[in-house]
Amino acid sequence: MYYGLSLSASGVLVNTTSQDVYANNLANVETIGFKPMMPGVQQRPPESQEDPAPFGTANELLDKLGGGVFSAPMTTGFKAAPPESTGRPLDAALTDNDTFFAVRVTDPNTGDTTTKLTRSGRFLPNSQGQLVTTTGHLVLNPSDQPITIDPHLGNARIDAAGRIIQGQEAVAQVQVARVPDAATTLRPDGDNTFAFRGQDNRQQATAFGLLPKHVETSGASPISTLNQMIAATKAANGNASMIRYQDTMMDRAINTLGRVA
């Protein structure tokens, strides 16, 4: 029964983790360019394999039950979501799965800056005229420098080539970076941005799909995400119920069946 408690407890832990992941996805179904996280599950080996006991105390029957489950590393779904028209001249939606906008993120505690990537293409000028995301991160040009918009040159807009147009002239270029195998080289890092797991492996994209006056919608589907969360909740509750049943059986085995008359 103790072994059964261990198996059920592992199921509770894994499914509550999945609940947290799906809850975060559900909270971001309206976030521009959001990419959903996908929890992973891996089989845990039986106790006799994971922690071999001396003198051959393995139990063949228990080994057949397995060792429960572990939470595996989470992955991110980078599939491009449908674009949505906004009519805003500085909005831009990327349509390729592996392209991103480069932004400069400043640590508020240390002042250190880091280049990160985002799919959120809702841009606007800040008080200094620099092009920023809705979270205040500086949008970078192909030279990794911030883009400044001169208000004296007229209204600015982004064209399909990622150029900032004022009047009839291109005054700047938005950096569009391509990342090979983004699922393994990028990790979510808050504020709808992605950081590199290791080396900065982005490449300047020379050809890419970009829709002006659009934004990419969230990659999290409200219906499917809600169904996933419900399934994880049911699985967690089922394992918790098994823990209660086994606890009751242990109580009776010790206090009732094991009572000495």
What are these regions (language model features)?
Residues 1-261:
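Amphipathic alpha-helical polymerization modules
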